[in-house]
A protein has these predicted regions:
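Terminal low-complexity, poorly structured segments
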Residues: 9-10, 14, 212, 324, ...
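Bacterial Sec-dependent N-terminal signal peptides
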Residues: 1-27, 244, 514
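Alpha-solenoid helical repeat scaffolds
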Residues: 23-483, 509-519
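C-terminal interaction modules of eukaryotic adaptor/scaffold proteins
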Residues: 488-507, 517
Length: 519
């Protein structure tokens, strides 16, 4: 006798499964199978298997143990109950196989259950039974290969995919292998992914495959130092992106890949390749505009930054400024991207001859950082460089006035951020030397002395520290020797210059010829 609760559940199940017209009759039509499976999943998930199973048995019996229905019930007992009811799952799998011994999903589900129970050998056994039941059922090969892939057995997964290709000539084995190796997140895996993408079944490639394939060449470009090799990788990235764009013209990710590749190629080409740079700038603008149009919520600050570059390369400065302002004012943008955006806005203003707007932009940003104590040397350097660029377009006192503005920024940067103070002093010497070309006024003495004293505290000097110390010694030695006519005072600087750089021609010449020293 059926329990009272079972009767209620059965009634609910039948009502949920059948349309009104069909409820007048028995569950006899297989057209209701998918709806029946869906309803059973809901009932099994929400009720105790002890009460539900007799109802499921009755429904399956009325459907003559339709294999799809039985496997649907088994799947629900295993995946939907929360307790992994293997007893009932296997019970309905057996019913499915009894009804149709070649019904592959029954074997696949059995393999999944054994794999979930960590019995790999049993799982493999049942996957192979599934293949024997139907060698042309592609899902079996994929499921078995992915199980091996998940355990890190990539060679075995490759063998299974190739086995599928042998049985089903249209099976995209190389594409599946490429996808598998792409997910390894290792450079050896990436190289294998590239090899298989090259021979992948193009007709089966989805938009995300083109994006993955293109991304691999972006990663390859980042790993090489040779400029030619970098350009070659970015060109391949663009080629793949454009193939993807042809097939999926509205896909955001392939458009994004095309945008990035075009910007990278443009940046790597020299000024002698002006025509090619224009070509890639046009491509970048095109793909950037389309990516933003199609991306909706996917569009992020990096996309706007790249699109801003494209517009700037196309000399569309007003439009570029607006795009970069989106990045600058975004709450989600990285600080590094905001700094890039601000510099690009300033550069665009400079191209438009609007130095005052660029200066205002930098100073407003600097004021905010000074207020919260986060201002660094490079914040001042940006403004100084702006003044230096402006000075190149001026003459006479106008030029000198702007150079002194740059000098003041370098001085503030050095005073604010001692870690980089040496660069500030170095740039002050350069500016003051350009104002006082013959060094008669000694305008560079103050920063040169500060730089010299700072470098004395650093011990052995290398790289940029060595470079700026050489500059300071040259300035001080020349000033005291030739302007102040004090060889005695100058000697310490020439000696320090030689000590810092024994190959320095000025030091060698002065010490051997003027001081008659043997080096």
């Amino acid at each position: 006798m059926i329990h009272f609760k079972n009767i209620l559940l059965a009634t609910a199940l039948l009502a949920a499964v059948l349309p009104a017209s069909a409820q007048k009759h028995s569950i006899s039509s297989l057209t209701d199978t998918k709806a029946t499976v869906k309803a059973m999943e809901t009932i099994i998930a929400k009720n105790d298997g002890h009460y539900v199973e007799p109802i499921i048995a009755e429904i399956c019996a009325k459907k003559k143990n339709n294999p799809e229905l039985c496997v649907g019930a088994a799947d629900a007992f295993w995946y939907k109950t929360g307790i992994r009811d293997s007893t009932n799952a296997f019970k309905y799998i057996k019913k499915a196989i009894a009804a149709n011994k070649n019904y592959v999903p029954a074997y696949i589900l059995t393999a999944e259950i054994w794999n979930d129970c960590q019995d790999t050998l049993k799982a493999i056994e049942w996957y192979n039974k599934a293949i024997q039941a139907d060698t042309l059922y592609a899902k079996t090969y994929r499921a078995l290969a992915k199980m091996r892939e998940k355990s890190g057995n990539y060679d075995e997964a490759c063998r299974i995919y190739k086995r599928a290709k042998a049985a089903i000539p249209t099976f995209p084995a190389n594409l599946e292998i490429a996808r598998m190796y792409y997910k390894t997140d290792t450079y050896s895996g990436y190289n294998k992914a590239i090899e298989h993408f090259k021979i992948a079944e193009v007709d089966s490639m989805e938009a995300y495959d083109y994006n993955s394939y293109a991304t691999l060449y972006n990663l390859a470009a980042e790993q090489v130092q040779d400029r030619g090799a970098k350009v070659g990788n970015y060109l391949k990235m663009l080629e793949i992106s454009e193939e993807g764009i042809q097939r999926f013209p509205k896909d955001f990710y392939v458009l994004e890949a095309g945008l990035l590749a075009a910007v990278k190629i443009h940046d790597m080409l020299g000024q002698s390749d002006a025509e090619k740079k224009r070509e890639y700038a046009e491509k970048a603008e095109n793909y950037g505009e389309r990516a933003i149009a199609e991306g909706d919520t996917l569009v992020n600050d990096v996309i706007y930054k790249l699109y801003g570059f494209a517009l700037k390369y196309r000399h569309k400065y007003d439009k570029a400024i607006k795009v970069f302002e989106r990045v600058l004012n975004s709450d989600k943008a990285e600080e590094a991207d905001k700094d890039i955006a601000m510099k690009q806005i300033a550069d665009s203003y400079k191209e438009l001859g609007e130095y005052d707007k660029a200066e205002e932009l930098f100073k407003n940003n600097l004021a905010k950082k000074e207020a919260n104590g986060t201002a660094k040397y490079f914040d001042y350097e940006k403004i100084a460089e702006l003044f230096m660029d402006q000075a190149q377009e001026l003459n006479g006192n106008d030029k000198i006035d702007v150079l002194w503005k740059a000098d003041a920024m370098y001085a503030k940067g050095a005073a604010t951020d001692l870690q980089y103070a040496g660069y500030g002093y170095y740039n002050q010497i350069r500016i003051r030397s350009s104002i006082d070309e013959d060094n008669k006024k000694g305008l560079g003495l103050e920063p040169a002395r500060k730089l010299y004293a700072m470098m004395l505290t650093k011990g052995a000097l290398e790289g940029n520290n060595k470079k700026i110390m050489v500059y300071a010694c040259n300035y001080l030695g020349s000033y005291y020797h030739f302007t102040k006519k004090s060889p005695k005072e100058a000697k310490q600087y020439w000696l320090k210059l030689y000590e810092t750089d024994p190959t320095n021609k000025n030091a060698i010449l002065v010490l051997t010829k003027l001081y008659k020293m043997k080096l």
